[in-house]
């Protein structure tokens, strides 16, 4: 932080995208500095516009001294017009077929997806004489989202894939959501290393607090009739007035106080034992607009964690770990309020819980220029909630218990001074819903049932990205993001095929401070179903090209 250094960039790209960013750092005293991050983006994006404005100033003083302080602010506003969905057509075996060009926006000019995020953060670090450190952070924030989007469907619900053409009529339904949260977060943790009982200990202990006062309406559709359109006329400029009644709010407040401690004990020069414990005091209360349905949750939750690390040399380590955790987000449990008093299961259902066992290893390779990680895991989730606002009211719990077994592979770093690689892959050969009260639909479709593989759980997923310095001034790179086939959540009899999306870039250093970079995302313009839902998909981003000029001064 104690350096006068600045960076600015300008990007122009597909969809008439303009983006300017700046990162400015000023020394203001012997141990004080001011930093300012700012950005502006405007993008028509063929109708699905994405405009953003953001600024984040921060000031730090006492840097590196006994008492270090900081204060920062963050503000980001977005004005968008979303592609909410594209309708799918199914093959006889249940395969999801994409139907429309990925970049085509068939919504209305009056659609929008606007967000606002703002928060203030205060920080203090106290350094003790014995090398201990107390790090405290306090943040207050306000977050808003207001979305009114068009749901796209075929007027002829029985149309087949081969019958779709430029004149095919599309309907525009309405989907509206609005929400606001006031959030207070505080965390203070103490860390130190010391010798006790003839062993070296690295201790971390602390407390955190999270307070969320929120209001939501997840079903706030426009009542005004909406015109149809045709496949061959995307972004046709049609608009309707907002005919909705004043918003009716579901409200909730959630509080969580967490206490945690962890000790890493060096048993020998090569063997370390890690033990930790976390306690959460979680409570939340929910109420519908009329106040006729309310629900309260209150739990005291204990999460143990233990691990063993073996480091035979400086270049490798092996570990085994076991841990549990709970979901203490108030948002997760809000959909119980949508049920009637007679069917409300939320109050009687314990909170979401996860349990994870992992065995892995890490290796430093290529003269410590790269890090390789391999891990095997077994994870369980209990009382999994449905957080999809469109379906949670009818199916609040996805499963009583499910598990997944798999492996993760990671490689990051330079294989040679010129060649850089980033690779991650997750393989989940075994995943199953172990307990569920969901009944199998008469037609064999519907939501996943006990014994099924959970939705949105592909066997293979990952990405690889590699760059190579061709000369001292020219660097080129390419990579692929991929995913194998999977089912949507709530649609066990249909599936989306696997896909791979290729990105590429080339960068030229004009001098040691200025460079220009060309990025091509989705190089081969692959059309694929990225987000999967019950009855529709969100298309993956179409091919885009961006040219960025960046300079440091």
Locate each region found by the language model.
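Face-selective signature of the C-terminal outer-membrane beta-barrel domain
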Residues: 120-142, 170-287, 373
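Gram-negative outer-membrane beta-barrel transporters
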Residues: 369, 373-380, 398-490, 512, ...
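Acidic/polar loop-and-plug regions of large Gram-negative outer-membrane beta-barrel proteins
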Residues: 41-45, 58-62, 66-127, 142-181, ...
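Membrane-embedded beta-barrel scaffold of Gram-negative outer-membrane proteins
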Residues: 125-127, 133-139, 143-151, 317-319, ...
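Outer-membrane beta-barrel translocator/receptor signature
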Residues: 1-57, 63-68, 118, 370
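Structural signature of Gram-negative outer-membrane beta-barrels, strongest in the C-terminal barrel
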Residues: 62-64, 181, 200-204, 208-210, ...
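Repeated loop/turn-to-beta-strand initiation elements of outer-membrane beta-barrel proteins
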Residues: 31-34, 66-71, 131-134, 198, ...
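C-terminal beta-signal and adjacent terminal beta-strands/loops
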Residues: 416, 473, 481-489, 507-553
